[in-house]
Amino acid sequence: MTAEETKAAESGAQSAPLRLEGVDISPKQDEGVLKVIKREGTGTETPMIGDRVFVHYTGWLLDGTKFDSSLDRKDRFSFDLGKGEVIKAWDIAVATMKVGEVCHITCKPEYAYGLAGSPPKIPPNATLVFEVELFEFKGEDLTEEEDGGIIRRIRTRGEGYAKPNEGALVEVALEGYFKDQVFDRRELRFEVGEGESMDLPCGLEKAIQRMEKGEHSIVYLKPRYAFGSAGKEKFQIPPNAELKYEIHLKSFEKAKESWEMSSEEKLEQSTIVKERGTVYFKEGKYKQAVLQYKKIVSWLEYESSFSDEDAEKAQALRLASHLNLAMCHLKLQAFSAAIENCNKALELDSNNEKGLFRRGEAHLAVNDFDLARADFQKVLQLYPSNKAAKAQLVVCQQRIRKQLEKEKKLYANMFERLAEEETKAKATVAAGDQPADAEMRDEPKNDVAGGQPQVEAEA
């Protein structure tokens, strides 16, 4: 009998009426949730709001009737703490537990299933008793890929449901830690999306966008979402360092969403944002520049209420944004994105010099030499004085020639091997080394002077 089977058998042994006992841990101190520790846990940490917790439990009515047990199913139960996924008593009690702890929780109806109960096993207005064992807990993964790169643990819940969006003006207090040593302690006011200019890692901004006003959280960042392979000399952070931040979102003002803006506002803001993106580009902050240019595209791409004059301005801004995005992606070696933005630019202006040239550069970078050559040739056809295109076309021709020579050599070696194998096979046959069941027939004689059959000589 396994340990869990033994525990399951013991958990079903309750039959006598249960007593109300324990320490009152309800927020209102109304004896709605009573807790008795049956076995102490280890360490000092307890789960925080939003943590994923893993438990075993057994539940009884006050008369001793067991109504549910994860032990019977031999499957640990998990839920996100403080998110309302379980009864109130559980969110309250499990938040006080340590790993390895076993406790009994007595829950009054208002902290359990209330007047309705949970038919057919739990009657209306029922007081319940649970035995709960906590096995582990872990923070909330905020990454889209769920790769564990940004983990949040909420110390203090915020208010309301609103969260900062891209471009929101936020006010925060933060502390950054590397190996338990504080390297950054500041109070800041900035726009979401411009954190890099404030020496903040991208992962922290992503976490801020998931926070509520007044929330105080701990954020753990893997290198990819921190300062990456470059590190941060200003803070003496080495390459590929994992970081921890404690952050308090004091307040924020959401930026207007695209649908909330008039066409005039979109045009005005696009001009401002374009200048900001140019500043970031000149400073070598290409990721920040990308965010700015993407805003322009999102505001203007599907806007159809411009006057004729404003429509021309909007198209010029869109064209410039796609060209600048292509340049940023080339710098970031994101060549597919560069090609995509060049294509968008060329949809707006099919003979655009920069669009053709930058697409050629991106094709060249991914060894699509024929496509690159076609782009550079078109640039020279339209703009014969473009010296950079002439130089890149020469590079293309050299790469294509080198590739052809490599392929020629590869195929030559292949045919040479095949010829050698064929010669060996014929030599074997000539020596009489044939299968016993080989059909015997007259073969045409080779000319001694020629040394090889006519067919092979032609080959």
Swiss-Prot record:
Instruction: Describe the reaction catalysed, as an equation.
Output: [protein]-peptidylproline (omega=180) = [protein]-peptidylproline (omega=0)
- Where are the N-acetylmethionine modifications? 1
TPR repeat intervals: 270-303, 319-352, 354-386
Q: Which cysteines are joined by disulfide bonds?
A: none
How would you summarize its activity regulation? Answer: Inhibited by FK506.
Residue positions where N6-acetyllysine is found in the record = 282
Q: Which UniProt keywords apply?
A: Acetylation, Chaperone, Cytoplasm, Cytoskeleton, Isomerase, Methylation, Microtubule, Mitochondrion, Nucleus, Phosphoprotein, Repeat, Rotamase, TPR repeat
Q: Please tell me which top-level EC class this enzyme sits in.
A: isomerase
Residues in PPIase FKBP-type domain copies: 50-138, 167-253
Documented EC number(s): 5.2.1.8
* Keyword Ribonucleoprotein among record annotations: no
Which residues are annotated as modified residue Omega-N-methylarginine in the UniProt record? 373
**GO MF term set:** peptidyl-prolyl cis-trans isomerase activity
Modified positions (Phosphotyrosine) are 220
Q: Which positions does the record annotate as the modified residue Phosphothreonine?
A: 143
Q: Where is this region: Disordered?
A: 1-22, 423-459
Give the domain of life: Eukaryota
Q: Taking the first listed entry, what is the main subcellular location of this protein, grouped into a coarse class?
A: cytoplasm
In this chain, the stretch annotated as Interaction with tubulin covers: 267-400
A cellular component term, taken from the record's GO annotations: axonal growth cone
Tell me the residues on which N-acetylthreonine occurs: 2
Subunit note: Homodimer. Interacts with GLMN. Associates with HSP90AA1 and HSP70 in steroid hormone receptor complexes. Also interacts with peroxisomal phytanoyl-CoA alpha-hydroxylase (PHYH). Interacts with NR3C1 and dynein. Interacts with HSF1 in the HSP90 complex. Associates with tubulin. Interacts with MAPT/TAU. Interacts (via TPR domain) with S100A1, S100A2 and S100A6; the interaction is Ca(2+) dependent. Interaction with S100A1 and S100A2 (but not with S100A6) leads to inhibition of FKBP4-HSP90 interaction. Interacts with dynein; causes partially NR3C1 transport to the nucleus.
Task of the protein: Immunophilin protein with PPIase and co-chaperone activities. Component of unligated steroid receptors heterocomplexes through interaction with heat-shock protein 90 (HSP90). May play a role in the intracellular trafficking of heterooligomeric forms of steroid hormone receptors between cytoplasm and nuclear compartments. The isomerase activity controls neuronal growth cones via regulation of TRPC1 channel opening. Also acts as a regulator of microtubule dynamics by inhibiting MAPT/TAU ability to promote microtubule assembly. May have a protective role against oxidative stress in mitochondria.
Q: What is this protein called?
A: Peptidyl-prolyl cis-trans isomerase FKBP4
